[in-house]
């Protein structure tokens, strides 16, 4: 997709973005109503007056600028003439200079005797001439300085905003390519038109943030840490309209169907969460260690009708936790099989009754064990059992919606604060304010420059990326540390398109790539994020060996040597061949998937 196409698509609103045509029909009806109103002569007169007023305003502003330029040129000519006169006077003797001084004194004395009527008619003294010239110079300098500051602020504002160029090219055929005064006047004229005929979506793009463009960022750079104290956060809801977002999501979805909800107290139960958020659509609540202590349930709500038969356990690891995809949380009343539910308990000496079994011979309560309840021998019904502890959330949950439209409805009802998006959860006890953190799909990719090609040999893998971190923020960190960043991507899962905790960074400079791989770790320190991430070479699924180019049985390269002596990908035969020498025997490989 071309650059202009992406920028054009980024200007579309949500309804046009989904392509349902409702927004277009509303706009057509609005345009028809406006056309009927314009047929009225009174409205035409008002519009003519507005257009005349606008033309007069721009004409007057243009005349003022021309007048300032003419006054500046005249001032230069006067200064040159005064310099020539001074040089000529310095070349003569002292008598002419004395004569001029005497004449000036005589004029000043005569001016003191002049009446007020004569002064009103236009006679001016030497002092008044000097004061007028100084006042004109001061006012001219102030106006010129303000004019220069005006253009300088606009030039700083235009940096990194290609949507401004595209918008003005769409409105006008002839426009300059550089940020000169004519371009800025054209932009100001467009902005005035949009103020007279408002368009909320275009006005969102053309927001004037001149004050923020002059703000300086305090950066502290070290070898393994980046601290940015004044990083400008993009808008959470209108990320596509921000200056940091040039990527357009190709597809109908805008948000991930998986939403993070934080700030939940222990008194809020799963039923309370389901009862409140079910108004937005069908969903399921999930959190880590909800099922069998550690296995995450990321099943799709659309698969709730499927019956999954678990395979027989093959080892003690499969007894401890079922295989991936075995549990479907959307199946009501799902109970794990007996061999899976009790295999680990029997192997570790526990019995399903709740107490210690064979290992201790029932010496510690064979029937009730450690149960603090009624002592009935059923661990699932007791208050202190492990199954009850697993069912309580950890202060946060994930909402797994069936449709993406539900997430957009949820975000629309949230209120925004400095920390993020919040909503008031109506529980059985009292209303609770909880944080809603949706994932915008456009945040998963960020391009620094469209014109720079991506070299696949200069791509680094970033492990341990915090899930709230966006691609633009990750690009900002690496740009401040190493520089020459071309593209940054956040890895997302295929089912919910939610971040997986890793990312990719593509460099345009070999030295920057080598420095990043050599450092191996970097600490991301920004606001509430403080985490050390790992930097490794990126392994593609068909990564070829750089030593033999896949000649050995067409094997891929699962090894990478980070030593500067090698610093390339190897297949297994080439690794043993190249590192058999004693000088390279101590090299430690970076293995794919480890």
Curated annotation (Swiss-Prot):
Residues 458-540 form the RRM domain. Keywords: RNA-binding. The keyword RNA-binding applies. The keyword RNA-binding applies. Residues 72-91, 367-388 are annotated as: Disordered. One of its GO terms (molecular function) is mRNA 3'-UTR binding. InterPro entries: CEBP_ZZ, CEBP_ZZ_sf, CPEB, Nucleotide-bd_a/b_plait_sf, RBD_domain_sf, RRM_dom. Residues 72-90 have a biased composition (Basic and acidic residues). Residues 367-378 have a biased composition (Gly residues). One of its GO terms (cellular component) is cytoplasm. GO terms for biological process: negative regulation of cytoplasmic translation. Cytoplasmic polyadenylation element binding protein that binds to and regulates the translation of specific mRNAs. This is Cytoplasmic polyadenylation element-binding protein 2. It comes from Caenorhabditis japonica.
